[in-house]
Amino acid sequence: MTHQTHAYHMVNPSPWPLTGALSALLMTSGLIMWFHYNSMALLTLGFTTNLLTMYQWWRDVIREGTFQGHHTPIVQKGLRYGMVLFIVSEVFFFAGFFWAFYHSSLAPTPELGGCWPPTGIIPLNPLEVPLLNTSVLLASGVSITWAHHSLMEGNRKHMLQALFITISLGVYFTLLQASEYYETSFTISDGVYGSTFFMATGFHGLHVIIGSTFLIVCFLRQLYYHFTSNHHFGFEAAAWYWHFVDVVWLFLYVSIYWWGS
């Protein structure tokens, strides 16, 4: 057995990046098949393989960081840089959606009736479900901060309570968003308004689901005493991600729901 003379984690060969990439390919291809041929077989296969990859990859990272001690301070620093870069890349993703929305809405073409929202589109009332969704996400931002402070103070019980509240609010937001989609009078195929609305809000909704999953994993880990006030980057990354989701929603609400209506 050899002993390394540095603090970096030399990761063992792993199949999960490959299976994750393949599952992403299956899901995106399956989404196209669902849209055009009304077949969900490929999408279901991709989603299932993605869930299996997530479970096993998360399991490996938890084992390496929590039980084997590979996540030294210098490794955690690298992970922090990685998470920051990931969130920055997500910012540019949403910047593209906002660009598409404002490009179309600030100078509506004659094809749109020369107005915004386009002729024939009945926008959602920003003071109804969208405002409730805003309140729900802002409240979840408060509860995730409460969870972080409780963890730093060593109060495990309060941290679990705050995490549970945050997860519940995230699930509630997703259900409200689904009900809102069900009640809209327009679809994703109704011109540029429908496509930008559903793409931007739907992509954000996907991020809420991902963030809720992230927080559920943190909740389950804390049930097994995985986090301490000194060793908790998994939770910290989830909290950063959740705050990012909150901020994006505020921009979506002001731009698409309030100003755009």
Swiss-Prot record:
Location of this chain's protein in the cell: Mitochondrion inner membrane
GO cellular component terms, semicolon-separated: mitochondrial inner membrane; mitochondrion; respiratory chain complex IV
Keywords carried by this UniProt record: Membrane, Mitochondrion, Mitochondrion inner membrane, Translocase, Transmembrane, Transmembrane helix
Membrane topology: Multi-pass membrane protein
SUPFAM superfamilies: Cytochrome c oxidase subunit III-like
CDD domains: Cyt_c_Oxidase_III
GO molecular function annotations of the record: cytochrome-c oxidase activity
Enzyme Commission designation: 7.1.1.9
Positions of transmembrane segments: 16-34, 41-66, 73-105, 129-152, 156-183, 191-223, 233-256
Reactions catalysed, as given in the entry: 4 Fe(II)-[cytochrome c] + O2 + 8 H(+)(in) = 4 Fe(III)-[cytochrome c] + 2 H2O + 4 H(+)(out)
Enzyme class, spelled out: translocase
Mitochondrial intermembrane side: 35-40, 106-128, 184-190, 257-261
Biological processes, Gene Ontology terms: mitochondrial electron transport, cytochrome c to oxygen; respiratory chain complex IV assembly
Mitochondrial matrix compartment segments: 1-15, 67-72, 153-155, 224-232
Principal subcellular localisation of the protein: mitochondrion
Pfam families hit by this protein: COX3 (PF00510)
Record carries keyword Metal-binding: no
Source species, domain of life: Eukaryota
The keyword NAD belongs to this UniProt entry's keyword annotation: no
Function: Component of the cytochrome c oxidase, the last enzyme in the mitochondrial electron transport chain which drives oxidative phosphorylation. The respiratory chain contains 3 multisubunit complexes succinate dehydrogenase (complex II, CII), ubiquinol-cytochrome c oxidoreductase (cytochrome b-c1 complex, complex III, CIII) and cytochrome c oxidase (complex IV, CIV), that cooperate to transfer electrons derived from NADH and succinate to molecular oxygen, creating an electrochemical gradient over the inner membrane that drives transmembrane transport and the ATP synthase.
Quaternary structure and interacting proteins, as annotated: Component of the cytochrome c oxidase (complex IV, CIV), a multisubunit enzyme composed of 14 subunits. The complex is composed of a catalytic core of 3 subunits MT-CO1, MT-CO2 and MT-CO3, encoded in the mitochondrial DNA, and 11 supernumerary subunits COX4I, COX5A, COX5B, COX6A, COX6B, COX6C, COX7A, COX7B, COX7C, COX8 and NDUFA4, which are encoded in the nuclear genome.
UniProt record similarity statement: Belongs to the cytochrome c oxidase subunit 3 family.
Protein name as catalogued: Cytochrome c oxidase subunit 3
Lineage: Eukaryota, Metazoa, Chordata, Craniata, Vertebrata
Gene of this entry: MT-CO3
